[in-house]
């Protein structure tokens, strides 16, 4: 069945749409949607954001090399407290320059930060030509929280899951875009079908009315039956106008979704055949659990809940931070000589904080976090059940839909044949107008049901692909070019 109906347009309507026409198949619409539609563009940008967030996370676990300098000029008057308690004002007139090179590495399993640095400083006293140097050729620094929340460890568990979720979410969205594009495609196909039906019925009603006029004049039908045919003719004319508006609206919706800027008349052509294959439920379920982003989302929510509980526990008890620093340093009036006879330097700092009386605040925060974790686990269990039920439902519906398409097609052909027979019988005066109207109604309903069954088939087809990230028709996984998005 060809759903394109431009050749059926009334003369007035045809004159109004004599511009460029573009006929699209379902495959062409889906290809354009996955490239140009707002949903596809949003999906690419969402994935790109997730990709760079993950890159930033991975970079935070690698050694970082930095160069720092903080030169300043100081010309001011400052006071100095003398030994007897008096205050003396001293004029400051100096320039300080420094340069520091440091390598910093986060240590995820302890949550600390390790740094190796080398620093050189120069102090010039203006007006005296006095210059001194302070060098620290090698300095090692380590700091961490001893009993606190280790964000590095939890990020190591959460961020890879978040990125896998983003990759799978992009794949799912591309298939959902295909499903949405098929909805717009069949919305236009259905509107075109209704217009084709309306045009056919209008032509038939006009022919029957003209034929009935002749029969009325020779007295073989009543005036009531003639008026009934005239009303039917007028109704069909109104139906054509309504159907044309529906076609225009559906075409505008499709044009908008495909981001087509040109003013072209869009028509779509449906294919009678649909792929004939069954999907094993067990295989679909296993693939859905492996490939669907919802599974990664549920996993991430559970880990996030555990992380929140660990954070609450860490903040409720003893907090301790340690800062260690050791290295070599020296000062002198000559830069090169400053590196001679280097002195050892060590610095150790430990800070402690223990809540003595917080009126149960810390314990309450732990209980809230634990309750939230239990709630998340319950919600994720229910979400998993709903997910599995949805997969089962989609698979069962899809496995039946090809048969339904075949039944709808045969019903459409049978109803069309019945209409032809009923029309001939009415023309021959062997049936009533009620029988003819019934045949017309069944023909129209069967035609619409067939297009609707095709739309349902392709919606289920792409929904199943979105759930499993698998092409069951060709028995192969769906692949997407992530690298092209990551490079842009």
Write out the residue ranges for each language-model feature:
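Bacterial Sec-dependent N-terminal signal peptides
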Residues: 1-21
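Acidic, low-complexity, intrinsically disordered peripheral segments
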Residues: 14-20, 66, 73-75, 274, ...
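Short flexible linkers and secondary-structure junctions
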Residues: 16-183, 320, 324, 360-363, ...
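Periplasmic alpha-helical coiled-coil/stalk elements that build and connect Gram-negative outer-membrane
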Residues: 24, 157-287, 397, 401, ...
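Amphipathic alpha-helical coiled-coil scaffold segments and their short linker/junction regions
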Residues: 30-34, 86-88, 221, 226, ...
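Sec/SRP-type N-terminal targeting helices
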Residues: 41-45, 58-59, 107-132, 146-174, ...
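Short segments within alpha-helical structural elements
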Residues: 49-52, 57-59, 206-210, 234-260, ...
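Outer-membrane beta-barrel architecture
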Residues: 102-104, 141, 310-311, 351-353
């Amino acid at each position: 069945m060809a759903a394109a109906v431009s050749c059926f347009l009334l003369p007035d309507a045809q004159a109004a749409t004599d511009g460029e026409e573009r006929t699209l198949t379902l495959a062409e619409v889906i290809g354009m949607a996955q490239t140009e539609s707002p949903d596809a563009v949003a999906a690419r940008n969402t994935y790109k954001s997730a990709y760079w967030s993950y890159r930033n996370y991975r970079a935070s676990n690698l050694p970082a090399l930095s160069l720092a300098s903080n030169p300043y000029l100081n010309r001011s008057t400052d006071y100095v407290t003398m030994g007897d308690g008096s205050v003396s004002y001293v004029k400051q007139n100096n320039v300080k320059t420094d340069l520091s090179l440091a390598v910093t590495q986060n240590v995820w399993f302890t949550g600390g930060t390790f740094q190796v640095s080398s620093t050189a400083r120069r102090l010039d006293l203006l007006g005296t030509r006095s210059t001194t140097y302070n060098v620290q050729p090698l300095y090692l620094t380590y700091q961490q929280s001893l009993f606190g929340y280790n964000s590095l460890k939890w990020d190591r568990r959460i961020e890879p899951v978040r990125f896998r979720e983003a990759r799978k979410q992009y794949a799912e969205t591309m298939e959902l875009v295909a499903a949405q594009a098929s909805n717009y495609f069949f919305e236009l196909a259905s509107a075109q079908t209704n217009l084709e039906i309306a045009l056919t019925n209008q032509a038939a009603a006009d022919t029957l009315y003209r034929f009935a006029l002749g029969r009325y004049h020779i007295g073989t039908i009543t005036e009531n039956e003639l008026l009934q045919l005239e009303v039917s003719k007028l109704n069909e004319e109104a139906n054509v106008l309504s159907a044309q508006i529906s076609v225009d609206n559906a075409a505008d919706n499709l044009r908008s979704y495909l981001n087509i800027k040109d003013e072209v008349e869009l028509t779509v052509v449906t294919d009678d055949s649909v792929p004939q294959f069954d999907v094993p439920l067990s295989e679909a379920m296993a693939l859905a659990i492996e490939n669907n982003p919802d599974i990664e989302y549920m996993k991430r929510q559970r880990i996030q809940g555990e992380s929140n509980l660990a954070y609450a526990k860490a903040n409720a008890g003893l907090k301790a931070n340690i800062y260690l620093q050791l290295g070599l340093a020296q000062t002198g009036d000559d830069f090169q000589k400053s590196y001679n006879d280097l002195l050892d330097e060590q610095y150790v700092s430990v800070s402690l904080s223990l809540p003595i009386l917080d009126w149960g605040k810390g314990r309450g925060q732990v209980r809230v976090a634990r309750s939230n974790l239990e709630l998340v686990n319950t919600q994720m269990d229910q979400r998993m059940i709903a997910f599995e039920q949805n997969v089962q439902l989609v698979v069962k519906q899809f496995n039946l839909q090809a048969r339904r398409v075949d039944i709808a097609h045969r019903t459409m052909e049978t109803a069309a044949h019945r209409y032809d027979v009923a029309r001939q019988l009415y023309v021959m005066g062997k049936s009533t107008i009620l029988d003819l109207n019934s045949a017309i109604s069944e023909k129209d309903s069967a035609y619409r049901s067939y297009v609707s069954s095709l739309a349902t088939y392709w919606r289920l087809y792409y929904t199943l692909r979105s759930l499993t990230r698998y092409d069951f028709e060709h028995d192969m996984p769906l692949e997407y070019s992530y690298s092209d998005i990551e490079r842009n």
